[in-house]
């Protein structure tokens, strides 16, 4: 007897929340000793190794159409930029703060889903955008200046959000023609090939220690592998809006783990602003939920 689709959908959502809550922490540890570009290559190499077995088993679930190939190329490029942005955002910053701000991916994806996939978006989405922006401003309330350096973390986190939102919309457009694991291996393979073609980067990879590879492996497992694959599977059972809103709660896990591992806690302004960001996302979710 087959598993109830609702149970499968819930399983993938819970798995996605856990992965998204964990992944910023090994990124943060890796950034203590590794350059961002080198880290991205290492993470993608590890994620590729994790993904190959499942993709090989499902290798026939790929429709070789020009549109699908073009989307895979776009997803690979966006994934490279997104992971580089993660590394830049986390350097010298809080993993929890990054995770909260990057949840803006949810609203960006809703808007992109409205534009390209014709998923419903109403007035509450735009109210949610205003609430989220207010929360971000409050989180940076101690540095409300026009100094770009003070906002570097926020800008990199928003870049991450935009890239991943586009990845999810593009992935959902071919979800029934390309299995998520096959898609993941193809985009990772392309990204690794492009990055290793950069002069000198392969040589820098050879200097990584076993400890460095351990943190990169954990970052790859929770990020490009488990986080992305489980999320893409979740899109088979849920709209982008519903699935991404569930991931809103992942920063709570990040906050807990960051305190346990790094002994770091957000300031009062950051906690209040982060809560406001999450409220804004839940406002957006209420809009999508009322439309079904």
Annotate each language-model stretch with its function:
Residues 11, 39-42, 97-104, 171-192, ...:
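Helix-helix packing/entry segments at the starts of transmembrane helices
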Residues 13-14, 66-74, 121-133, 153-154, ...:
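Cytoplasmic-side transmembrane-helix entry/capping segments in multi-pass membrane proteins
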Residues 30, 39, 89, 115-121, ...:
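Hydrophobic/aromatic residues within transmembrane alpha-helices
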Residues 53-58, 105-127, 251-272:
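C-terminal transmembrane-helix exit sites in multi-pass transporters
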Residues 112, 124-142, 195, 248, ...:
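Hydrophobic transmembrane alpha-helices of multi-pass small-molecule transport proteins
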